[in-house]
Amino acid sequence: MRTTFMAKANEVERKWYVVDAEGQTLGRLASEVASILRGKNKPTFTPHVDTGDHVIIINAEKIHLTGNKLNDKMYYRHTNHPGGLKQRTALVLRTNYPVQMLELAIKGMLPKGRLGRQVSKKLNVYAGAEHPHQAQKPEVYELRG
């Protein structure tokens, strides 16, 4: 009788990928990157082990939103003080904090717990085209579709 393969955390080989966000739709990019971070693109995927790869996203300031979401989509945060609910439109967030916009979308698609926090540390997002991870020799990842 055969048993199901279970990956061990210390046996996982991790790659580095570069994804160019220029002209990409926010949600479609985020779902594919979340899948790579979890390791779902590997045959050795194990749900309770971090088997994913590192992802570097460049040109976050050039991400695309469909429809009228730039003006209609709101991002909320709270200061933890009474009456401290703050809100920003997607246009303001993309203009002033483009990295935060992508990180929020991707982290929302990851598990909520210890594994999700561990997986999200492998995400590196940069507003421009430059990144400081050349020493890791990242591969260019072509998105589907």
From Swiss-Prot:
One of its GO terms (biological process) is translation. InterPro entries: Ribosomal_uL13 (IPR005822), Ribosomal_uL13_bac-type (IPR005823), Ribosomal_uL13_CS (IPR023563), Ribosomal_uL13_sf (IPR036899). GO terms for cellular component: cytosolic large ribosomal subunit. The keyword Ribonucleoprotein applies. GO terms for molecular function: mRNA binding; structural constituent of ribosome. Keywords: Ribonucleoprotein, Ribosomal protein. Part of the 50S ribosomal subunit. This protein is one of the early assembly proteins of the 50S ribosomal subunit, although it is not seen to bind rRNA by itself. It is important during the early stages of 50S assembly. Belongs to the universal ribosomal protein uL13 family. This is Large ribosomal subunit protein uL13.
